[in-house]
Design a protein with these regions (language model features):
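Conserved RNA-binding domains used in RNP assembly and mRNA/RNA metabolism
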Residues: 1-61
């Protein structure tokens, strides 16, 4: 998953689903050490790659 994110989604705005009611959104800033870093509105979200169920390019960045 990490190599796919780096090669295909680096710099893209994505939505990330990890289960439950929450979907995380933001621009893919980095993906290293099995952690995905998203940036949105000057704040960062760090997501453990092994917790990701699905991710997709956001329709409305």
């Amino acid at each position: 998953m990490q190599s796919f994110i780096v090669e295909q989604l680096q710099g893209e705005v994505v939505d990330v689903y990890c289960g439950g009611p929450d979907v995380f959104s933001g621009k893919v800033e980095s993906c290293a050490g099995n952690v995905l870093t998203l940036a949105q509105d000057g704040k960062y979200t760090y997501i453990a790659i092994d917790k990701i169920i699905a991710l997709w390019r956001a329709q409305y960045p």
